[in-house]
Design a protein with these regions (language model features):
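N-terminal phosphate/diphosphate-binding loop that engages ATP/GTP or pyrophosphate donors
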Residues: 18-71
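Loop/turn-to-beta-strand initiation segments
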Residues: 58-62, 86-91, 119
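Short, basic/aromatic-enriched C-terminal tail that caps enzymatic domains
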Residues: 200-212
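Conserved catalytic-core segment of NTP-binding enzymes
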Residues: 71-87, 96-196, 211-212
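General beta-strand structural signal in soluble alpha/beta enzymes
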Residues: 4, 27-32, 63-66, 91-95, ...
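Short, ordered loop/turn segments at secondary-structure junctions
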Residues: 7-8, 32-34, 96-97, 176-178, ...
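Walker A (P-loop) phosphate-binding motif
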Residues: 1-22
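Short, basic, glycine/proline-bearing loop/turn elements
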Residues: 1-4, 59-71, 95, 146-148
Length: 212
């Protein structure tokens, strides 16, 4: 089970991973918080493993979740995560929210990572670097506090790395929207400053490279 946290791009990364893994395996996607109902795979709203198994007979990728009060969104499945972990070859969980902003800091109750998750991938949008903390970050006051900068200061690679290091929430960092020479330079700088493996690229273009 892999949990995906961080800034904007989580749903896109989840789909990219699901599409790749589905070439040779069954993949279950879900959320531990809220996510938009995917239109690219069957959605099981019945909280039963039998319903998930039936869906896998029709598609290698299945989404499981319950309808919530927000139109067009799903909540977590009505099943124990341990049971879900055994329902597919791979389970991908969107475990965070960022209000479509490229970067974020996490409050005490975030992210909502299932205890049985074996890997946590954090998404950071390189387009947030250079913007002010107040404009680029979800929970900007907390981000500024962890980075040791004013909330109106620009986000630098050093500030981003400081927040990621202080939180210590992820196993792998994925830097998204790296689509120019300048963006690659910034991504490489972030990779130099963090202690975890780093993959960077553009989900939109289907390009990526391992930087660390």
């Amino acid at each position: 089970m892999t949990a995906i946290i961080g800034g904007g791009g989580k749903s896109t990364l989840l789909r990219a991973l699901a599409d790749a893994l589905a070439q040779h395996a069954h993949v279950l996607v879900a959320t531990s918080t809220k996510m938009y109902v995917p239109d690219w795979c069957p959605v099981v709203r019945d909280a039963s493993l039998a319903a998930v198994e039936r869906a896998f007979a029709e598609s290698p990728v299945v989404c499981a979740g319950l309808l919530c009060e927000l139109p067009g969104k799903l909540a977590a499945p009505g099943l124990a995560w341990e049971a879900i972990a055994g329902a597919a070859d791979y389970v991908l969980v969107e475990a965070d929210g960022s209000r479509h902003l490229p970067l974020k800091a996490h409050a005490a109750h975030e992210p909502v990572v299932p205890a049985c998750a074996s890997r946590v991938v954090c998404v950071a949008g390189i387009d947030g670097v250079g913007e002010s903390v107040s404009q680029a970050c979800h929970r900007p006051q907390l981000f500024a506090q962890l980075a040791g900068v004013p909330v109106e200061a620009p986000v630098t690679p050093e500030a981003l790395a400081a927040v990621l290091g202080a939180e210590g929430l992820h196993d792998i960092l994925y830097i998204n929207k790296v689509e120019s020479a300048e963006a690659w330079q910034l991504a490489r700088r972030v990779a130099q400053l963090v202690a975890t493996p780093v993959v960077a690229g553009s989900l939109r273009r289907g390009e990526f490279a391992c930087l660390r």
